[in-house]
């Protein structure tokens, strides 16, 4: 069928034994001499807020820094961890790792931090699909370097990307945090679309500390300041926001929901979105891969769904819920 629909000659088809390793396509794309068939090469740009001579901690204290990869360089994220490893005022570094590159500067910086006498705690997710063996090896290396390695909560996969740096300053201890939608992988950061933020907001720092305490098994937070953490708290917050807009629409007030995500398969949230749309809420969202359609949620119709195919894997998840 594929040959017929694409008008492919039988001489262009090659049969092989076993599954095809598609990673060879990356090497093929890198061959020289075929620039006519390639998209223009994009060079990640520097982050304006960091284009001065101040150290990264000084820049973060000036205000939160939003990062948008690969359009902006991933270097500030690597630099954040590396600076923390070498800064004599830094007391501790805590980080979650899901996937990293083969020769990871992040891993090297964490090992350097431990060697410099800092308290380094790293959650390495051993259930990261296709990277189980790599992550076991990274965990062993980090433990050998003196890092405290943890493996998360039983029955759950830790997919969050968080770095917490605890630093002693003139006015006391300050917590610096990086939150991101993408892995701490300097290679894929050049290909995948992700967002991140560097901040020293005290409430986010407190939440990040609570996340690591929870992942370490020390305690479970009673409440959160800014963060919403799955699987216990995130869905409930989304449902409350969606239902708030539904009530605004039913009362005749403006109501609007915009969302962009990597995948939407939660039927409870999907049902709430359909209910909001039927109540008059303007619902617009884009899903990159998977979407449970109206046929899976009986009684509702889709009122504003779109998907797209682009050059890069887009794993940014955004929600905007607004009303008057």
What are these regions (language model features)?
Residues 1-257, 275, 279, 288-324:
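N-terminal localization/anchoring segments of enzymes in phospholipid and broader phosphate metabolism
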Residues 265-274:
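Short glycine/threonine-rich loop-to-helix capping motif typified by GTGT followed
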Residues 262:
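Cofactor-pocket helix-loop regions in the catalytic cores of large enzyme subunits
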């Amino acid at each position: 069928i594929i040959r017929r629909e694409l008008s492919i000659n039988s001489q262009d088809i090659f049969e092989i034994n076993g599954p095809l390793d598609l990673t060879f396509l990356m090497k093929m794309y890198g061959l020289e001499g075929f620039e006519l068939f390639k998209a223009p090469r994009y060079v990640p740009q520097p982050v304006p807020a960091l284009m001065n001579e101040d150290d990264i901690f000084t820049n973060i204290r000036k205000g939160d820094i939003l990062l948008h990869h690969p359009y902006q360089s991933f270097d500030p994220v690597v630099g954040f961890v590396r600076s923390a490893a070498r800064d004599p005022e830094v007391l501790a570094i805590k980080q979650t790792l899901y996937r990293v590159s083969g020769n990871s500067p992040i891993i090297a910086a964490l090992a350097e931090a431990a060697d410099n006498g800092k308290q380094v705690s790293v959650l390495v997710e051993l259930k990261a699909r296709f990277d189980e063996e790599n992550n076991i090896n990274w965990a062993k290396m980090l433990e050998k370097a003196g890092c405290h390695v943890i493996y998360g909560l039983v029955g759950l996969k830790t997919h969050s990307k968080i770095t917490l740096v605890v630093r002693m300053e003139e006015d006391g201890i300050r917590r610096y945090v990086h939150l991101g939608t993408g892995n701490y992988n300097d290679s894929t950061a050049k290909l995948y679309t992700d967002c991140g933020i560097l901040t020293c907001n005290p409430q986010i720092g407190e939440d990040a500390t609570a996340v690591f305490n929870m992942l370490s098994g020390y305690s479970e937070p009673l409440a959160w300041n800014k963060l919403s953490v799955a699987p216990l708290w995130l869905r409930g917050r989304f449902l409350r926001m969606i239902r708030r807009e539904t009530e605004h629409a039913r009362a005749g007030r403006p109501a609007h929901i915009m969302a962009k995500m990597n995948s939407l398969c939660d039927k409870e949230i999907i049902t709430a979105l359909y209910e909001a749309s039927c109540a008059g809420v303007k619902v617009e969202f884009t899903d990159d891969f998977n979407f449970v359609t109206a046929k899976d949620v009986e009684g509702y119709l889709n009122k504003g769904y779109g998907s797209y195919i682009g050059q890069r894997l887009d794993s940014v998840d955004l929600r905007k819920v607004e009303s008057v």
